[in-house]
Amino acid sequence: MDKLRVLYDEFVTISKDNLERETGLSASDVDMDFDLNIFMTLVPVLEKKVCVITPTIEDDKIVTMMKYCSYQSFSFWFLKSGAVVKSVYNKLDDAEKEKFVATFKDMLLNVQTLISLNSMYTRLRQDTEDIVSDSKKIMEIVSHLRASTTENAAYQVLQQNNSFIISTLNKILSDENYLLKIIAVFDSKLISEKETLNEYKQLYTISSESLVYGIRCVSNLDISSVQLSNNKYVLFVKKMLPKIILFQNNDINAQQFANVISKIYTLIYRQLTSNVDVGCLLTDTIESTKTKISVEKFKQTGINNVQSLIKFISDNKKEYKTIISEEYLSKEDRIITILQNIVNEHDIKYDNNLLNMRDLIVTFRERYSYKF
């Protein structure tokens, strides 16, 4: 919103100066909210008349769009004259034209984002009731699983809730904003503050394309040295995954994915319970973090459920992002060494090549760390 405000101010300043000079009329007071509503109505019309607005749109298309934008719709020039944005553009020198086109283009792109946020904002409010209901059902299933004393009893719980689990997974995997909606249930700021919604959208929106790519990458891991555990949980997952629409529509081998996930789970459990280096790393991290996090602050806040915990983290996210970042960066080399040793020991390959954990982690950090 701050960027849009700057772009809007630039657009208004250039427009007012030229309109007043050319007509001899004085501009009216500026009402940004009023004008943004006009732009939000205008953008779909411009896209229908000219073309879809994208970051790669050509400048001549932007200039064409200027012909359809009449200043008399905006607060600062309301009903004063029939001048269009292109008439101001025509009066500028080449350098000013280039800057004006860039400003107008970026403003339209930001308005487009605002339209998307408004739509998501409305859907968030509508969908939270369903998500609350789903969340309660999920917690109920988890509670029954924890209370199960045998593998057969746990399997029965999963079987009894098979339809709900499949329908919920299909819902989650078909909606790139589902994770965002779950957070909105616990953090009301997403409903009341659009800037917070935009910030969280950058973090927690996961596209179907990204999911499919990630699933394929995991499926293609070669972890043949780890024995497959065909327990009842794995069998349940194997029966369930082929019914997931994302797997059906993208021709993903559900059995292969389930096998790899089972092996990864087995490997992680084994490392957490028997790898001395992993144990030392976790202990050192916990001890180091204790010196940076105030236990008293937790107590004073009165955190007693998931909702209050998420709200606390949201209110203090800048502080905790800094702590996590410092902890990770100070231990990155150690983490990479431990992971590479595990890869080497178990001969874990991707595309017939041994995984290079340093390349993988550094690439991920460079591409995606800005999100966190």
From Swiss-Prot:
**Coiled-coil regions listed:** none
Provide one Gene Ontology cellular component: virion component
Source domain of life: Viruses
| Domain-related comment | The N-terminal domain is not required for crescent formation but is required for virion formation.
Query: Where found in the cell?
Result: Host cytoplasm; Virion
Name recorded for this polypeptide: Virion morphogenesis protein OPG132
Please name the gene that encodes this protein.
OPG132
Give UniProt keywords alphabetically: Host cytoplasm, Virion
Regions that span the bilayer: none
Q: Which InterPro entries match?
A: Poxvirus_A6
Q: Which organism is it from?
A: Variola virus (isolate Human/India/Ind3/1967)
